[in-house]
């Protein structure tokens, strides 16, 4: 109530004042001149620069305050687990570093001589370039005044001497101060004068004294009078509360993760303990690394498997082809022998030559063309030659017939050699003749063709494996694992018994008595003896040298024992007890001695 009354009084007083000012304005005359008031232009306030955008509370994960503006005049953020220095508190000021800035010369090249000039006096000169080794008389970057090397004037000499004297004094004063005692308190030897007026004015009125105050001289070697006592430490602050989860039992995986392997040395074992292999590997730390297997191993294995399968298929097809060729060769040989036997029977029976010639020609037409076997001209062609011999006795015809006979004799020798070969060697020879390189043939009457790159390479050597270095490894025990003349015709030529007939007496010389003698022998094994040694009738014929079998000594566990160590140890363990084998050996020795 009182407060509202006071407000009404103040409002009335203001209204009266306004009315008095209006009455005074009406009483005053009008002004003759209008005046303009000049106001200073107040500059507009600059727009406030926006401060850094600080993330709100709860959204500061991963945010790092770096500048002083990030703290916004406040303290550190406890939810940011990084080093923070609000208002640069606790931040160590780094001194001036010794790192040199990269400098370049007028050509833009790096000045490496700045390292040699670092830390020296400003006027000192360091010779750090190649031009410093060149005499001044031969240098082009030096002026004539620098070459003359004039003496300095008296003023520069005096300045240098004064600068040297001051430097020596600083060094001397430093040495003297280092020898003086330290921590000596400085005393003020000046006396202080004090005007003293006594307070009791009744005794001596207006009597004043002048007192001189000086400090008492102290002995610098006097021991300290007071002893500093350490204040006992106050009670410790209560530890901050830490929210902890309730204790739980450790699982096997937790115990395995927290397991620290024992420290086992790979070089020392002074006590000679037997350390298990798993403990040693655990101390090595290799179990902490994950093993990553490259996918290329699987790809490589798959490629090898596919290549092996293709090669096996090719080898199987090649073997089938060789078997087929051998079968055809065998069939042709049997047909040839059958024709020879039929011709011999016809000759003995006295049949006409025309009938035998027609039969021989018909049989020769049935022979397979791919075998390339010739019957030696026992057909109608030979009969025609005999008739021509009877009709014409010309020397030229005789010479031609001799040439034909020589060619046929060579063919018969080749057929005989092929008949004595095995099926495998015959198939190899046929395959070799089928795959002959024809680049060596020369076309007669034509220009020599230019050699191409394809003819310079022998395709028969592409799939052959080269010999390894040294022909065998050091630890191999297979020095005689292959026969001496394996797969070659040399063995058949060396170990074949020499025939009694010469080249001109093949097939009995072409006479009836010779053919009968040849047919009386074993017709299916041409070139072999009809009679051998006693007891060798059931032995199969060999086409090469005698092959011996390798004695392999087998240990008790089934592995190879080339030196007989296991047998020696077994005999030693038995302690010299004689076995049945030893008794048999001794019995054989006695029988031999008797």
Curated annotation (Swiss-Prot):
Residues 36-63, 223-254, 370-426, 498-523, 566-594 are annotated as: Disordered. It is found in: Nucleus. It comes from the Eukaryota. Keywords: mRNA processing, mRNA splicing, Nucleus, Spliceosome. Residues 398-417, 513-523, 578-594 have a biased composition (Basic and acidic residues). One of its GO terms (cellular component) is spliceosomal complex. Residues 383-397 have a biased composition (Acidic residues). Coiled coil: none annotated. Residues 44-53, 235-244 have a biased composition (Pro residues). Pfam families: SKIP_SNW. GO terms for biological process: mRNA splicing, via spliceosome. InterPro entries: SKI-int_prot_SKIP, SKI-int_prot_SKIP_SNW-dom. Associated with the spliceosome. Belongs to the SNW family. Involved in pre-mRNA splicing. This is Pre-mRNA-processing protein 45. It comes from Cryptococcus neoformans var. neoformans serotype D (strain B-3501A) (Filobasidiella neoformans). The lineage of its organism: Eukaryota, Fungi, Dikarya, Basidiomycota, Agaricomycotina.
